[in-house]
Every structure is written in C-alpha cells, then in structure tokens.
Amino acid sequence: MAKAEYKSAIRSRRMIQHALVELLQEKELDKITVTDIVTRADINRGTFYAHYADISGVLDSIMENVCQTIREALEKQPLWAKAPDARIVLQHLQRMLESDPEFYRNAIRTNV
C-alpha cells in the first residue's frame, strides 16, 4: 500500500508542475492562482496543499528537479578530474530534455 501511495504522490506533484508550466505559457505568474493549477491538473486543492505550500513552492520544485539532474551528471565524473567532461554533462541534459520535451520546452520558454 505504501508503494502505491508513493507513486500517487509523485504523479500528483508531476501533474501540478506540468499544470503550472502550461499556465505560464498563457499568463503571467502573478495572475496564476492555485485554483487555476488544480483545475488544469484535475486535482483538488487538498492534493495541491498536501504537496506544496504555495505556487512558489511548485516553481522551487521544478528548478530543484532540473538542478538535481545537473548535479547527478556532474557527480558521475571521477573525483580526480579537474573539470567535468562537458560532453557527458550535455548528454545527460539531453536525455533529461528528451524524457519530457514538451514540459521542458515550456519551462525554458517561461520567464519566471
């Protein structure tokens, strides 16, 4: 049961993040409400607040996911390397972007 709940939480957070990125393509951040996000994500407000305190928390989560992907790519470099091999980092970033191109395309286009 706990594993299913964990998957459900991941799914809910992903839906919230995607909804926010989509909405940012339509209107300014300060015009987006939690109601807009939950309507777009097709979840209830309780689900939103179970995962995030506010909209800025969703933005922080999106950025943390991107930063974590970059950190993981850098950590794969040998400790003795003076500088990370840019090719490996770029390949990892490419895989990340290809995993969900629409999401990252919208996130990159967004001026937040």
Region annotations inferred by a language model:
Residues R11-E22, E26, R40, G57-Q77, ...:
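Alpha-helical structural segments
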Residues E72, K76-Q77, P101-V112:
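Short secondary-structure transition hinges
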Residues M15, T47-Y49, F103:
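Residues in the helix-turn-helix
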Residues L23-G57:
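Helix-turn-helix
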Residues M1-A2, P78-E98, E102:
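Primarily secretory-pathway and cell-envelope proteins
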